[in-house]
């Protein structure tokens, strides 16, 4: 997965987490997620073109999801920004390994298919539930 794919996942998850607030400014998403604003603009534009986001300009502007988090899969978001048919496209796909001459294309195809199956069934609603469960397991430590 590229940085663009990772940033897209972070941005959509951030918007899903804060969706009750309505429009979320790009600067807030960038600051919370540690994403350069110029790069985030490109990612959000791709997600907007794909129909996952809507935006409003101006001082009270920002971005919001156009669908519920349960209706957006991680795979769909990755494809929107990566522009590929698979979320995992290995470098050198189809090349032969050095030394023994085994064709690794079949292995990469299986790995890519397995990753696709996971991200195509995993929604941002699922990620929100996981984050909430992880937060509930974190207990404060009091040191005296």
Question: Model regions: which residues?
Answer:
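Key DNA-contact positions within bacterial/archaeal DNA-binding proteins
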Residues: 38
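Beta-hairpin "wing" of winged helix-turn-helix
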Residues: 52-66
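A short alpha-helical element within helix-turn-helix/winged-helix DNA-binding domains
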Residues: 24-34
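Short alpha-helical segments that sit at the start of domains
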Residues: 1-12
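C-terminal regulatory/oligomerization modules of transcriptional regulators
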Residues: 94-144
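Basic amphipathic alpha-helical segments that dock to polyanions
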Residues: 15, 29, 43-50
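Conserved segment of winged-helix/HTH DNA-binding domains
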Residues: 69-93, 109-114
